[in-house]
């Protein structure tokens, strides 16, 4: 049966991780639906072509702010529905922690979402300065992180500007600072207390919670802090309890366990006479990056609706049992709000693959023993001995490598051994059955060995740092040609001079593989690949390894009537920009270039040509111009 776009949907799992925002169109190109209710589809391949006409180059980060607002609407809608179903006597406010992505367009889009209650969180003085400026009057602002006097003064000033600013005490030492600075400014603060839970959730970020967590007050510290605040006349200012179990919680059962402990703290604080009427459940709401809807670190076994139901129902039942008024619910679900809205696009610049065949060998009997064995194995076509042939061939290759290192084989002989082994492995791979348990290990080894290397125009460290740092899985697939069957498997390599500069995990149907299905790319072909769900943390965590800088980026909005609005175009960092960042003056470098061209035996025409090349080079992108 001929390959279809439905086969590509299944292969890459786009309908499992795409959350309705991404799909494969009938043309074989990826389509984006920024607002599911509008039903407007954007052909991603055509969009890249159009943006190229506006001077934007690959690699390119495309943001869809409409997705941000849809995510906020979905999140708030899930809580509103749970509140209505439970008859809960208070409201929900979604708090966006700007550390997840501090881009102005991101923050503005989130707080501009209509018909929802939205607030902001700051975890540092720079973030608080940004939040105080961007937040609309009356906005709920949560201040987390380590705090000094300046931080606390800024928060108190924010209160006077008409915001509802919660200063969350994370360390006992912050209590005295809040007392002293609130007296100096004569501002009654809104105070929150962060409790340190014993419960831990299983995730890549589980160490942000639990007893060994970096932040939060232990039971003893909580008592000490409340005693101090009451003694200082600020007991009535303690209005919020906060906890955080960790980011990307995969298993909803872990969350239930931790939340049960957290609401006990809420009851105890109320019993102390503190008017706590806000519960900030922190982060933890995950994203189904691999589409498996499981307990994998890169997935979640629940959705927004179940998450909201757990929180609202448990609070509702607990408050009813203990005669406590229902508190307002806050959550800091930044990852769930932002991950889907950004897509990284890159082009394949080169392909490296092992040979499919080897030329006929003359006088095989004159070859060295391990090479003769390889030739014999290559001619042995016994499907019952497939795994044994592989192990024997691998041993022969090891012998060849030893003999070459000892000077007993020539470079040509070593190259012949490598080609023979590659072609033999390709034949064996075709004969193996992945479904047979006895052959699965060899099948997987050969799949890895035979995968092509697709060199792509991007930097893992700059654009996808979590894939390197914590083995984060992100969905990756071709942007176009999806009506064609992909016939190759490849590992994507970046431009950096670093062996870690590659993507090691790929969503393949509903599993994670070490290579991905791709189409044949011949010399001169354009082949675009997209990495999805990069809107959370990746932009701000990216570093400048090998001095690769920011890519081109753009915001794409869908306006009423379905027309697209392109805005927020930001050009890539130039080589000059990157050198300045590491305190290398381009002006000084130009002077040095000029001096060096004069010191060499160059004629005036060559000197002028070379110097002009240096000048032009400083203005270019750090990425490849292809």
From Swiss-Prot:
Reaction catalysis annotation: L-arginine + H(+) = agmatine + CO2
UniProt keyword 4Fe-4S present: no
One Pfam family named in its UniProt record: Arg_decarb_HB
Pathway: Amine and polyamine biosynthesis; agmatine biosynthesis; agmatine from L-arginine: step 1/1
Binding site for substrate: 279-289
Enzyme class: lyase
Residue(s) carrying N6-(pyridoxal phosphate)lysine: 99
Record keywords: Decarboxylase, Lyase, Magnesium, Metal-binding, Polyamine biosynthesis, Putrescine biosynthesis, Pyridoxal phosphate, Spermidine biosynthesis
UniProt keyword Transferase, yes or no: no
EC number(s) recorded for this UniProt protein: 4.1.1.19
UniProt cofactor(s): Mg(2+); pyridoxal 5'-phosphate
Superkingdom field: Bacteria
Entry-linked CDD domains: PLPDE_III_ADC
GO BP term (any one): arginine catabolic process
One example GO MF annotation: arginine decarboxylase activity
Function: Catalyzes the biosynthesis of agmatine from arginine.
Protein family (similarity comment): Belongs to the Orn/Lys/Arg decarboxylase class-II family. SpeA subfamily.
PANTHER family, per the entry: ARGININE DECARBOXYLASE (PTHR43295), BIOSYNTHETIC ARGININE DECARBOXYLASE (PTHR43295:SF9)
Record's protein name: Biosynthetic arginine decarboxylase
Organism, as annotated: Chromobacterium violaceum (strain ATCC 12472 / DSM 30191 / JCM 1249 / CCUG 213 / NBRC 12614 / NCIMB 9131 / NCTC 9757 / MK)
């Amino acid at each position: 049966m001929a390959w279809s776009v439905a086969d590509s949907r299944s292969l890459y799992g786009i309908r499992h991780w795409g959350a309705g925002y991404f799909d494969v169109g009938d043309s074989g190109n990826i389509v984006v639906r920024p607002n599911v209710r509008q039903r407007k589809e954007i052909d991603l391949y055509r969009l890249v072509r159009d943006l190229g006409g506006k001077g934007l180059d690959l690699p390119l980060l495309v943001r869809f702010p409409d997705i941000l607002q849809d995510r906020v609407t979905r999140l708030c809608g899930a809580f509103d529905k749970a509140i209505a179903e439970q008859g809960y006597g208070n409201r929900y406010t979604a708090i966006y922690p700007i550390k997840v992505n501090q881009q102005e367009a991101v923050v503005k889009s989130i707080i501009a979402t209509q018909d929802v209650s939205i607030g902001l969180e700051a975890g540092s003085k720079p973030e608080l300065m940004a939040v105080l400026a961007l937040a609309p009057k009356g906005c709920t602002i949560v201040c987390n992180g380590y705090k000094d006097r300046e931080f606390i003064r800024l928060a108190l000033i924010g209160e006077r500007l008409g915001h509802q600013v919660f200063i969350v005490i994370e360390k006992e030492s912050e209590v005295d600072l809040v007392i002293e600075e609130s007296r100096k400014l004569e501002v009654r603060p809104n105070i929150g207390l962060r409790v340190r839970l014993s419960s831990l959730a299983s995730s890549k970020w589980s160490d942000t919670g639990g007893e060994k967590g970096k932040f939060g007050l232990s039971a003893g510290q909580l008592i000490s802090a409340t005693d101090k605040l009451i003694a200082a006349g600020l007991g009535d200012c303690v209005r919020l309890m906060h906890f955080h179990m960790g980011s990307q919680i995969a298993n909803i059962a872990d969350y239930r366990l931790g939340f049960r402990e957290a609401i006990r703290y809420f009851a105890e604080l109320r019993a102390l006479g503190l008017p706590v009427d806000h519960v900030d459940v922190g982060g933890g709401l995950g994203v189904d990056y691999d589409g498996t809807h499981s307990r994998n670190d890169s997935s979640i076994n629940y959705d927004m609706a179940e998450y909201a139901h757990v929180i609202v129902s448990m609070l509702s039942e607990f408050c009813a049992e203990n005669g406590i008024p229902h508190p307002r619910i806050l959550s800091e679900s930044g990852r769930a709000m932002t991950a889907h809205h950004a897509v990284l696009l890159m082009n394949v610049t080169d392909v490296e693959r092992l040979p499919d065949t080897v030329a006929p060998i003359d006088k095989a009997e004159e070859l060295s023993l391990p090479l003769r064995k390889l030739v014999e194995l290559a001619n042995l076509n016994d499907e019952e001995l497939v795994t044994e042939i592989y192990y024997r061939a691998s041993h022969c290759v090891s012998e060849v490598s030893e003999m070459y290192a000892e000077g007993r084989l020539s470079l040509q002989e070593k190259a012949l051994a490598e080609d023979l082994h590659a072609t033999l492995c390709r034949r064996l791979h075709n004969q193996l059955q992945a479904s047979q348990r006895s052959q699965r290990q060899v099948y997987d080894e050969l799949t890895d060995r035979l995968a092509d290397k697709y060199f792509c125009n991007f930097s893992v460290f700059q654009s996808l740092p979590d894939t390197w740092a914590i083995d984060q899985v992100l969905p990756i697939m071709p942007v176009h040609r999806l009506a064609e069957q992909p016939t190759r498997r490849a590992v994507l390599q970046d431009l950096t001079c670093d062996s870690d500069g590659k993507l090691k995990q790929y969503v393949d149907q509903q599993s994670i593989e070490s290579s991905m299905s791709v189409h044949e790319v011949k010399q001169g072909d354009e082949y675009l690949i997209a990495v999805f769900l990069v809107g959370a943390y990746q932009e701000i965590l990216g570093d400048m390894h090998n001095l690769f800088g920011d890519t081109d980026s753009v915001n794409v909005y869908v306006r009423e009537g379905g027309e697209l609005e392109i805005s927020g175009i930001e050009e890539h960092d130039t080589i000059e920009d990157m050198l300045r960042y590491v305190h290398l003056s381009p002006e000084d470098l130009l002077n040095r270039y000029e001096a060096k061209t004069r010191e060499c035996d160059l004629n005036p025409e060559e000197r002028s040509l070379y110097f002009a090349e240096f000048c032009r080079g400083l203005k270019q992108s750090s990425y490849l111009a292809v």
